[in-house]
Swiss-Prot record:
Protein name in the entry: Histone-lysine N-methyltransferase SET5
InterPro entries the UniProt entry points to: SET_dom, SET_dom_sf
Pfam families: SET
Group of enzyme by EC: transferase
MF (Gene Ontology): histone H4K20 methyltransferase activity
Keywords per UniProt: Chromosome, Cytoplasm, Methyltransferase, Nucleus, S-adenosyl-L-methionine, Transferase
Amino acid sequence: MKDLTAEAAISPSDDNLLPALASLREGHPDKGILKLLAQLKIDHPEWAVSEKRFRKALQLAPCPGGGEADPKEKALVADTGLDPSIDVKSIAPKVEVKMFAGGKGKGLVAKEELKQGEMLWQEEPWIVTSDPGHYSLLTQSMMCSQCFSLFARPSPPISVPCPHCTTAHFCNRLCYTKSLSSSHPPLLCPGLNPDASSLMNFIRKRGERSVEGVAKILARWRGEREWDAKGKAEEMEKRIWKGMARVSQKRKEMERREWSYISKARMEEWHLIHIMLTNVLNPSPTHENYKPFQRLLISQHPRRSKPVPLTEKEVKRWFSFESFLELLGLVGLNQEDSGGLYALHAHMNHSCEPNIQVRNLPKSYTPPTQDTLPVNLPPPIQAGDRVSNKLTILARHEIQPGEELTISYVNMKMSRDERRQALREGYGFWCACDRCMREKEQPNGEKAE
């Protein structure tokens, strides 16, 4: 029997679709793209709207920053959602998560009035990635592989080397323990998984920090799936695939003007990296690393249990080429230069006039007490200060309840055009914040006096 509903479906005009889409976003701010599309089909069963057209329609929604979008400036709409694993109330009592309408996704807002210089929270990375500028210090045991604290000399007496390889060194036993899930997981330790050596050498030789992030995400999930309580692997799956903003790296780079010239080389490079990752973290039964990898999984299991093979669904979710591109895009969107991926920090949206400052402060820093606020922001780091990759989140000025907390993703000293181009290439959107709107009519996008 023919589907009369499908036969009767019509393609709505933009004049009808866009207002409906705006109402849909407003009424369901917590839903992702695919769930919104499903809701649209429920609300308007008479319409035929493909996922491709639906995504294009979302690109005409307001840009991040609160201004109005220029229809000629299409944005990439990231898939995002809420991360139920983060206890925001205990980490940052004066902050709450909010889902915004108009394609903006999630963000953070103030629950109470915040004073200038007030510390909102501190946070360590849950996935640690190193700046290429740190490679020589790390390989010479002059820096902690977990927190990036500098040593006064190589391998100081109180430090802890990795017991299995010579590529990682730590401040103390605590940093070493943290590293097993965030910076130096067993599945990427060359002493335990020899095939990881060529992968990590490739990453450092090429300065592929985003690939390092993908490798450590996969290694952490695989380790938690094999050795820890099942709940941890499920929690991480929700964080990655439902909680963090992501856009396929291929979709991002297809927006580049030179894509038609570089696409073949980029695809070949991505396929090569994907194969390397798979051989290290999920080798096939015919690969030479398969048996050593199985022995490693058994040796690290608390009960020395035989590994349970990944299901077809798990392989597709974590190790397919399409998932690799999604993870690569996710790391690119969420990675913080000073240390890697931070769970709560990743919730903050961009503004060219941010009200939040993110700092790596000396370990001697003491937050101001409530009765001493407001205070000036801490001075710049001085030579000799002992810092780490722990982030300290500070209010730049007074912030009212309900006001969104924003940071700048780019150098605020750049001109309007430079900032917007950098944001488009790095994060997929054209900024329409108040500052960009004010500077729009000025020559060269320079900031007003």
